[in-house]
Amino acid sequence: MASAAIFSSLRRRRSPSLEAFLAPVDLSGVALVQTLASISSEVVSCFTSVRFSFQRKNARSLIRKIEIFVVLFEFLVDSNWGSTTTRTRARRRSKSSVSESTALLCLKELYLLLYRSKILVDYCAQSSKLWLLLQNPSISGYFHDLNQEISTLLDVLPVNDLGLSDDIREQIELLQRQSRKARLYIDKNDESLRESFYSFLDGFENGKIPSSVDLRMFFVEKLGIRDSKSCRSEIEFLEEQIVNHDGDLEPTGSVINGFVAITRYCRFLLFGFEEDGMEWWIENNPKKPRKGFVAQEIGDTFITVPKDFVCPISLDLMTDPVIISTGQTYDRNSIARWIEEGHCTCPKTGQMLMDSRIVPNRALKNLIVQWCTASGISYESEFTDSPNESFASALPTKAAVEANKATVSILIKYLADGSQAAQTVAAREIRLLAKTGKENRAYIAEAGAIPHLCRLLTSENAIAQENSVTAMLNLSIYEKNKSRIMEEGDCLESIVSVLVSGLTVEAQENAAATLFSLSAVHEYKKRIAIVDQCVEALALLLQNGTPRGKKDAVTALYNLSTHPDNCSRMIEGGGVSSLVGALKNEGVAEEAAGALALLVRQSLGAEAIGKEDSAVAGLMGMMRCGTPRGKENAVAALLELCRSGGAAVAEKVLRAPAIAGLLQTLLFTGTKRARRKAASLARVFQRRENAAMRSGVYGFVGNTNGNRDGGFTTDVSVPISISISVPVL
């Protein structure tokens, strides 16, 4: 028996109830035939007048079969079949209860078939046209399976023992003969359309863009997709299938991705920038600040990749995870390129690389493969065992890339010369395209999108501004695009302007995230910090922003703190004060402590941090309750405060309550680097020869001094490690 469960996985919005898969054990006799009459009548009334885009003949044939069942069930209801009286009469006639039991079992099985028929017909009525077209052979097979099961059931059903009238019995027997003769039917016209759709995919794969005449004939004339709204609905449905796709289904997620790209291209090629209500809102609310334009779209369509599966450098799903000497995992291509560019530190932790060897992380790769299979995502590793499989999976990706390139060309034209509404829609689409894949980010920038997006940053329309700054953020993740953005005249200043006075909260947060992304390049850190109001706005966002805004701000401030020339700007702009205040916030305390540990290495920074009343208490709180990495950052900051902050600041640290106990705990339970920092700080205490502390923690440290590793004496500048990532929106 064909499984009906497949239909529930294909349409997330309308899942069938559990009744679709379980026989009605609690129904018998009169109640059962009444239920069957109700279900069959509902199917006929709901779908008789429906105009099916595809599977017309199969759907109509199934509905006609159900119409005959309606007549059967209504007769059984009218004759009170299954009641005590009718059962007694039947037993007298047949002198056996076998036929009655057989009939009851058949009717219960028919209950399941009717429910599955309803699900299948409803699926054909509600699904997108393109999806039905792609699934045409499979869905035809589902109809044939149902027909075969109906035929088998009618062969078993004891028709002669149901007490039917001659007319109804003749209809049932005719239905039985027709069901036996029925064959799998696949509409030739539908198959021809499906082949045309695949030919468009092949054309893009081979670098040959189909003509607008052919595309219009296919989408508008043949499929009846006549406006932008309908086209967008088709795209959203296909994207939904990528999220929910079962690994057994065809086509694969990567192939569907190619069809999504083609449909998106046709949307703008054939219908321009007609939109379902967005233009009206843009034109009538140009200055109204509103929260969450971008956030409303995030998560509804695209699947969220677990952060442990994302490469910290490329921010894409890792296809070949490898481990470096610091223990961090990166995608092979990304970390290899990082090392080839002359970097000798870990991108995530800042630690020096002991060597350039990389070791495959097979355990993580297996987890990624399992997750991709469960999520219906094609896992395209460049280091698979089968080159042919890798090549086959890459072909549809090429088609998607070419179709997206063609779409980007149209979008940029409207971005340059279109109306305000068209520019806003174009910016939104570019943002979505730049959301995934370095190829998308690369050719969007190469096609010239950045100058036009830069102009939209100063737009007085909230939606346009938010989409443009978010698109800029997504583009900046690609390394080469960072220089394109920084070299574009006034682009950096415009991003800072959005940070300072953006029309939506999300726009301000995404501007901060963009600055964090750009500041990953060392030579840009100083340029960013000296822009008027930049540090001040980041400090304000860290103090008053949303949890996500605080995270964006603290990571940007951390990056700026890594440049020694930015120390004075961090102090003047309130960055130091906001970082000290952030030590109380669990969500950003670790990064704040890391930034302070960097700034405090300079005497100017140490002096400024020492003047903050809550600095020492905040760092000690981090030592007490922070994460292992946060404790490392906190003890490192306190160590540098004692060394560079002057006698008064050192005295404040040494006299802090509970410092002895915290150091002792850290010396035993901290990470290797935290223990080294704690030992160095303890030696600073000893050199101060503070009598009060000598009777406390020094007794402990003095006893361990003779046995500690000599390496502690020189290990006083271990880089600070924090975990940070760029959001892709």
From Swiss-Prot:
Gene3D superfamilies: Leucine-rich Repeat Variant, Zinc/RING finger domain, C3HC4 (zinc finger). Pathway: Protein modification; protein ubiquitination. Keywords: Repeat, Transferase, Ubl conjugation pathway. Its EC number is 2.3.2.27. It catalyses: S-ubiquitinyl-[E2 ubiquitin-conjugating enzyme]-L-cysteine + [acceptor protein]-L-lysine = [E2 ubiquitin-conjugating enzyme]-L-cysteine + N(6)-ubiquitinyl-[acceptor protein]-L-lysine. One of its GO terms (biological process) is protein ubiquitination. ARM repeats lie at residues 438-477, 479-520, 523-562, 564-601. Functions as an E3 ubiquitin ligase. This is U-box domain-containing protein 17. It comes from Arabidopsis thaliana. The gene is PUB17.
